[in-house]
Structures are given as C-alpha cells and as structure tokens.
C-alpha cells in the first residue's frame, strides 16, 4: 500500500473532557529540580515520570520552542511528506509495521518506539531525556492524578497541569503545529515517542481552550517536544 492510499483512512481521536478557563497570568515562582542544564518537575505520578518545565528549543515554560516531525531531531522550514526523513520512493524506511489494520507501507521492522538517535529530546538534551510514551501522556492527563486548566503564563495561552498529590505543576503552551507550509494557532500539539497502529502516524497530545485529547497524526507534522526523564 502506498502513502497516497492512506488518506482515505480516518484519524483516531480520543474524547476529552472540558477544561475550566482562567484569564489571569500565572507568574508563580516554583522550586524545581535540574539535570543536564534543564529543569524538571516531579508531579508524584505512579510511574515516577519527571516532566521537563520547558519544550525543546525553549528557555522559558511559556516559549513554544522548536518543532519536530516524528523521528526527526532537528527543526526545519517545511514539514511535509516530501521533506520527511523516513519516506523514500513513497515508502516508509524506518518504524514500519504490518497489522490487521493495514498492509505494509515499506520494509517491515516492527519498531514502534523511537530509538534514542531518532528522539528529539535525547539528541538535543542528552541520554537521560526522552519524548514521552503514549502511556506517559495518558498518565499526565489522567484525572486521578492531575487537574488541568486552560490559562495564560506571561500572556501565552496553554494548559496548566497540577498534581493532586503534591501541588506541583507544568505549563504546556499552545504553540500549534506546522504542516505543508501552514501553521495552526491556539492549540498545543505535543509529540510522543510511540508509533500508532499505522506506520504513517504517531500518537500525540493535543491541548486547547475546549479540552485536551490524544490521538494519532501524520508523522511529518511539526509539533512541540516536551521531554521526560525518570
């Protein structure tokens, strides 16, 4: 099956709940830990995952930072299938699966999680950092463990995710995404390191004023990268 045949398939998206709104700026000073020159927060999550306070390419929590296609480690001017590193001659050349959902789009290697050399967090921040897995973003937005509110930080819209266990929080700015020469605004799209059930798509976290959601998106889309560590 070629890439062009795929676009008749629908995007998977998981229903989200409505967030409370908040218009005031949140300029609180928070004492966070630091490793390899980057701050992180322990939200007391069951997995022990530690979330960075900034995106890759950003120096402040409210900055959007750089945008990365899935399994690419450097930002670029154009995000499209034509510029995607792992598509050659209309076939996927790495992270290719075959399943009941689809036939193969290339040579099957059954890799479903990013290798360190293809992980934007690892390459840019060091070996102790990774992009979150699909399970880790599920945990981050799980109402058992965190509260989520749409708010602003220094004039930038995004979501504040606060631990129910210890009251610590992270802010995810709504920096949009980049694709085919277009860009979106008012929504935050965040990479995971996990391939979807299609070789052409990967899981992501989406946040906006109406709620949050997670689903899958074409691998070539440029998205924000928020690293994690343990």
Task: State where each predicted segment sits.
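C-terminal motif of bacterial Sec signal peptides marking the signal peptidase cleavage site
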Residues: 18-21
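Bacterial signal peptide processing site
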Residues: 23-25
């Amino acid at each position: 099956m070629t890439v062009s045949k795929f676009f008749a398939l629908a995007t998977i998206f998981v229903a989200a709940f409505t967030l409370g709104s908040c218009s005031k700026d949140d300029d609180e000073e928070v004492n966070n830990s630091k490793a390899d020159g980057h701050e992180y927060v322990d939200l007391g999550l069951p997995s022990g995952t530690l979330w960075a306070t900034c995106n890759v390419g950003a120096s402040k929590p409210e900055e959007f930072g750089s945008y990365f296609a899935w399994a690419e480690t450097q930002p670029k001017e154009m995000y499209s299938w034509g510029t995607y590193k792992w598509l050659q001659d209309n076939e996927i050349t790495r992270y290719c699966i075959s399943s009941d959902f689809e036939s193969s789009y290339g040579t099957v290697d059954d890799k479903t999680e990013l290798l360190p050399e293809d992980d934007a967090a690892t390459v840019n921040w060091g070996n102790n950092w990774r992009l979150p897995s699909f399970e880790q973003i599920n945990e981050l937005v799980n109402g058992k463990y965190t509260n989520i509110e749409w708010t602003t930080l220094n004039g930038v819209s995004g979501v504040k995710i606060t631990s129910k266990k210890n009251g610590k929080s992270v802010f995810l700015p709504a920096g949009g995404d980049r694709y085919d020469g277009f860009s979106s605004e008012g929504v935050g799209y965040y990479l995971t390191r996990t391939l979807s059930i299609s070789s052409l798509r990967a899981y992501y976290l989406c946040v906006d004023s109406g709620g949050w959601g997670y689903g899958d998106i074409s691998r070539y889309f440029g998205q924000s990268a928020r690293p994690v560590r343990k």
